[in-house]
C-alpha cells in the first residue's frame, strides 16, 4: 500500500513570510508564479507513478497545486483531515461557498463552514492549533488510511501535516512516498 504525499507549491504567504517579522496576514494564500512552475515540474515526476486517486486539503494553495499536477485526470476528494496546522494567517481557510465559486468543478458541500481549527484567538486573531491537536488529527487519519487499505493515492497537503505523519518536513512540491504502518 503506497501513498504519495505532496506538499503544496510556493504560496504568496511562503514567498514573503519571515520568522523574524510579523505575520503578513495573507489568508488562504494562492500559489505564486514560482509555485506554478514547481507544480508543473512535480507533474513530470508524478506522471511516472501509478496513482489512482487524489486527496486534497481544502486550501486554495493545495487545490491549485493539485490541479496543475493532475489536471482533470482524477476527481479530487477534498478532505479537511489533511489540512495544515493553523499557525499563521495563511492557515485560515475559505468558506465552502467561496471555494465553490473559485473552483466550481469541485464539491465542498461536505465541509463545515469553518473547517479549519477553531479555538482561542491570539493577538493576531488567529486560533493557533496546538501541536497535540495536530498529532491527534494526523493519527486518526493514518489509522483511517490503514483501515480502508487506501492504495496508489496522492495526498496534496502541507508541511506540518506531512511532518507529523512522516517525521519529514518537505519542501514546496516535494513528493514523499509513505507506507502506513
What is the predicted role of each segment?
Residues 2, 6-78, 173:
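Active-site-proximal alpha-helix that buttresses catalytic centers in soluble enzyme cores
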Residues 15-16, 20-30, 72-136:
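Phosphate-handling substructures
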Residues 15-16, 65-66, 88, 164-167:
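Short glycine-/acidic-enriched loop or helix-start segments at secondary-structure transitions
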Residues 39-45, 134-143:
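A short, well-structured juxtamembrane/interface segment
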Residues 56-57, 136, 156-157:
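Short beta-strand scaffold positions
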Residues 60-61, 83-86, 162:
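Short, catalytically relevant binding-site loops at active-site mouths
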Amino acid at each position: 500500500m503506497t501513498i504519495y504525499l505532496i506538499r503544496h507549491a510556493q504560496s504568496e504567504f511562503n514567498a514573503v513570510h519571515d520568522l523574524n517579522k510579523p505575520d503578513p496576514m495573507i489568508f488562504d494564500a494562492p500559489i505564486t508564479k514560482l509555485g506554478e512552475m514547481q507544480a508543473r515540474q512535480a507533474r513530470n515526476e508524478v506522471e511516472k507513478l501509478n496513482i489512482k486517486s487524489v486527496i486534497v486539503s481544502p486550501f486554495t494553495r493545495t487545490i491549485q497545486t493539485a490541479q496543475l499536477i493532475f489536471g482533470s485526470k482524477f476527481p479530487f476528494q477534498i478532505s479537511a483531515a489533511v489540512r495544515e496546522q493553523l499557525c499563521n494567517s495563511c492557515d485560515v481557510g475559505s468558506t465552502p461557498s467561496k471555494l465553490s465559486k473559485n473552483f466550481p468543478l469541485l464539491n465542498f458541500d461536505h465541509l463545515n463552514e469553518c473547517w479549519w481549527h477553531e479555538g482561542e484567538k491570539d493577538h493576531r486573531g488567529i486560533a493557533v492549533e496546538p501541536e497535540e491537536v495536530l498529532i491527534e488529527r494526523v493519527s486518526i487519519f493514518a489509522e483511517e488510511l490503514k483501515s480502508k487499505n487506501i492504495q496508489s493515492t496522492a495526498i496534496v497537503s502541507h508541511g506540518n501535516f506531512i511532518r507529523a505523519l512522516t517525521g519529514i518536513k518537505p519542501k514546496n512540491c516535494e513528493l514523499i512516498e509513505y507506507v502506513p504502518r
